[in-house]
């Protein structure tokens, strides 16, 4: 009986974790733990201050764009800025200042 109870508890714990993850409530420590497939074009995945994976405005560097307003403006190093490279195929990229 005790073994059955232990197995039931473990299965319950696993299923509750899967349900939380499927609802976007998966707790993360970094963006590498998040699944970006749920984000639309013009957004990028982040691990927010509450440690929950979510989508934020702006395509990441290398992501699709129609204009610079579609890009994540904080994605470049300090000595460069973001552009939407429409000549090279409509993607966000960094160029030196």
UniProtKB/Swiss-Prot annotation:
Keyword annotations of the record: Antimicrobial, Disulfide bond, Fungicide, Plant defense, Secreted, Signal
BP GO terms, sorted: defense response to fungus; killing of cells of another organism
Predominant cellular place of this UniProt entry's protein: secreted
Disulfide linkage: 28-47, 34-53, 39-55, 65-84, 71-92, 76-94
Protein's cellular compartments: Secreted
Source domain of life: Eukaryota
GO cellular component terms, A-Z: extracellular region
Family statement: Belongs to the DEFL family.
Listed name of the protein: Defensin-like protein 301
Phylogenetic placement of the source organism: Eukaryota, Viridiplantae, Streptophyta, Embryophyta, Tracheophyta
